């Protein structure tokens, strides 16, 4: 495709922290370009998933193509790729940015710059994108435009003099944003090859069409009837339909260079179009694949088990379909003595885990139990081999273990100065070591090295509570570091429950063992016999609590009479309880597995 035909295409995405008004701004842009009639408009048009709507966050990247007639009289085609703002979904952001030439940095004029937008903005600048600052929510009485501009310059380091001040809610100045997109974001550049190269931004499964992929065509064109090849797998597929979202699905005769749209090549296998891969023509392939974004490594692992064992094949199929749409999800089969067959799943963080579980339960009608999440440790065995360890119950015997290393992350926290003391106290409690503190205008940037196990579970919630919601967090993995770790096992009536094992720092083992026993005592229902709950490190019991037995009053029917009769009945009851204890299984409720999560709170 010639550079002339690409001159009027603008591919952009919006970078913003959670709740800074990104989806609302997208709604206004769609409305102004006439993508949907006024009666079809609904809040957060692009957040199509019901969970996104309820939580008010964007999880999946979405795309929309809009024609816009600018003030210079020319018609431009704007391809907007929506991105999530939460730290767990940063891989969705890096993928969307790889398909763009520019980005709008949306900052809430009342709250100022937040950590997640800083991280995503750096990703955009590294990929060579033109970043246009937009100050949103200027209709709020607390909005301070000059302060927000100064913060963008101090914290992110890009020029904010020409920042566009808008209110997405009222629609004020949205036309200026569109003009800025047209004049400041460059058109797609022609590549050095004229052979087809298209980046897969996202894929999802449609019950009628099979796999539908969202692609950005870098060079060449895709038409229905052409035979395409997936470069990493070498598989070929025949294209059935191509088109764009306006945001409704609209079919086209071809997708040309610089355009973003969907293609359907009746791929039935969910792994047929891996996200981040390159598509090319089978007859005339491109010499090399596009530089994809880096593959995200899952950081949190948990077991997912169906409550009803017959649902196991359905769970596998549901995870397969979700994986297509969620490139960061990993899973492999696992069996547990306590829970039966299920899957060990890897997630990017706790929010990601909650959302995957919620989607499985809602969209696929599954009833699931999840085990306590754990991070990946590195275990150096005495024979010199290093094994990654994402499941505490699989830890080798301690006499075979030389050392256990835990993942350490670098956390960057942005906060108003008033809360610095509270945040430092929180980080020290979590075994953190301080790297530095920078005062940037009205914000303070605090850098810490923290163990990932401490951050993953509830650090985010605690950070919000000690800073009254003002602090924001971004983190990335640094290295593995040796530490004194032990595995705390939970025994119920002498039987080890593998799903309740946790790996903890030795100094916390006694306290965690005690808390776990107390919590389990509250949650395990009373049986006809005493239930002993014990926490153990190796063969040493560190804590115990007992759920007392329920007693039936066997003497109720004895009115008076000889005492030996009563003794006989009590002895008989005792014998029965003894026998029951030998054969009785204790049912452990789902809340008990989640108790491991809530212990720190």
Curated annotation (Swiss-Prot):
Keyword Plastid: no
Main location: membrane
InterPro entries: EF-4, EFG_III/V, EFG_V-like, EFTu-like_2, G_TR_CS, LepA_C_sf, LepA_CTD, LepA_IV
Record flagged with keyword Membrane: yes
Gene Ontology molecular function terms on file: GTP binding; GTPase activity; guanosine tetraphosphate binding; ribosome binding; translation elongation factor activity
Span of domain tr-type G: 7-189
Catalytic activity, reaction form: GTP + H2O = GDP + phosphate + H(+)
Family in the record: Belongs to the TRAFAC class translation factor GTPase superfamily. Classic translation factor GTPase family. LepA subfamily.
Protein name in UniProt: Elongation factor 4
Organism of derivation: Xanthomonas campestris pv. campestris (strain ATCC 33913 / DSM 3586 / NCPPB 528 / LMG 568 / P 25)
